[in-house]
């Protein structure tokens, strides 16, 4: 018989995930259907979102050549029935206080930075780049993880060296870019561009660097269609940029610079977001989401 969720002690809540303690070495990481945008957790939820994030992470944890924090399969008997398919048993790590971002294309905050300074996170770039320009080689741009509700802070590589040492900083940079390139090459073969993504790493009890949290989910990555890709224009996305775009549109009536929280999402935006997440999972993994374990929406 599987344990109940209340058999485990709740440790922490994030924007999307809940963390529970299983034992001294293992945690239960549960992905909810919550969605965040512009540092707000929205009132609306996206049906099946937590299961899709978990399915995508499981696929890429097994695909990329990097040790990770998984400590059991997605049907591990330690996972309670009520969260099956949206929860993973993971090793407890000493998490590093930064996100490791790989950028293959100029977009988002990187584009704004470039337009203002000619650089992205302090890295000089050639003139004449525009929205969705592809970099000659992907950029590594670390960021300090902010507390819930605040913005992450981009930091220079030299600052990262001061924080973790030159050996660990080089290891984080090299592993981030290696993982990104491996996954981006696979995604291109399925008609998907991974424009950018972010990773988190932690250290285990033996001092090993492990990939942790989530990887290549539509929450942590920008996904574009190869067929629709055009330099100089905003791309069609298969990620939560779809939600961000609606929130800043006149249709939402929300003023980002104002004091009010974002409005609830209309039903058509909720369903379209779910379909985007499902589509990118199925195209990249080659599997049907209908076959993923756990109770669906």
Curated annotation (Swiss-Prot):
Superkingdom as given in the UniProt entry: Bacteria
Protein's GO biological process: 'de novo' IMP biosynthetic process
GO molecular function annotation: ATP binding; phosphoribosylaminoimidazolesuccinocarboxamide synthase activity
Pathway: Purine metabolism; IMP biosynthesis via de novo pathway; 5-amino-1-(5-phospho-D-ribosyl)imidazole-4-carboxamide from 5-amino-1-(5-phospho-D-ribosyl)imidazole-4-carboxylate: step 1/2
Enzyme nomenclature, EC number: 6.3.2.6
Catalytic activity: 5-amino-1-(5-phospho-D-ribosyl)imidazole-4-carboxylate + L-aspartate + ATP = (2S)-2-[5-amino-1-(5-phospho-beta-D-ribosyl)imidazole-4-carboxamido]succinate + ADP + phosphate + 2 H(+)
Gene Ontology cellular-component terms listed: cytoplasm
Keyword entries, A-Z: ATP-binding, Ligase, Nucleotide-binding, Purine biosynthesis
Database matches in HAMAP family: SAICAR_synth (MF_00137)
Family: Belongs to the SAICAR synthetase family.
NCBIfam families: PRK13961.1, purC
Protein name, as recorded: Phosphoribosylaminoimidazole-succinocarboxamide synthase
UniProt lineage: Bacteria, Bacillati, Actinomycetota, Actinomycetes, Mycobacteriales
């Amino acid at each position: 018989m599987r344990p109940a969720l209340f058999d485990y002690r709740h440790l922490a809540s994030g924007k999307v995930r809940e963390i529970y303690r299983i034992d001294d070495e293992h945690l239960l990481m549960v992905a909810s259907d919550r969605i965040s945008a512009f540092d707000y957790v929205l009132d609306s939820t996206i049906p099946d979102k937590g299961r899709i994030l978990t399915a995508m992470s499981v696929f890429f944890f097994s695909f990329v050549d990097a040790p990770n924090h998984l400590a059991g399969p997605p049907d591990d008997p330690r996972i309670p029935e009520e969260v099956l398919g949206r929860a993973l048993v993971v090793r407890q790590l000493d998490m590093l206080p930064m996100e490791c971002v790989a950028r293959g294309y100029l977009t988002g905050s990187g584009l704004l930075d470039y337009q203002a300074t000619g650089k992205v996170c302090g890295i000089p770039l050639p003139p004449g780049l525009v929205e969705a320009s592809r970099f000659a080689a992907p950029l590594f741009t670390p960021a300090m993880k902010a507390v819930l509700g605040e913005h992450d802070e981009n930091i220079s590589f030299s600052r990262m060296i001061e924080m973790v040492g030159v050996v660990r900083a080089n290891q984080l940079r090299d592993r981030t870019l290696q993982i990104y390139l491996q996954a981006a090459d696979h995604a291109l073969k399925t008609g998907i561009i991974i424009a950018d993504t972010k990773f988190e790493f932690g250290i285990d009890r033996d001092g090993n660097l492990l990939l942790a949290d989530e990887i290549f989910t539509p929450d942590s990555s920008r996904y574009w269609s190869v067929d629709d890709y055009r330099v100089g224009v905003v791309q069609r996305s298969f990620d939560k940029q779809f939600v961000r775009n609606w929130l800043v549109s006149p249709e939402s009536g929300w003023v980002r610079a104002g004091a009010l929280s974002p409005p609830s999402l209309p039903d058509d935006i909720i369903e379209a977001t779910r379909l985007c997440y499902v589509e990118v999972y199925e195209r990249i993994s080659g599997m049907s989401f209908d076959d993923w374990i756990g109770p669906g929406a």
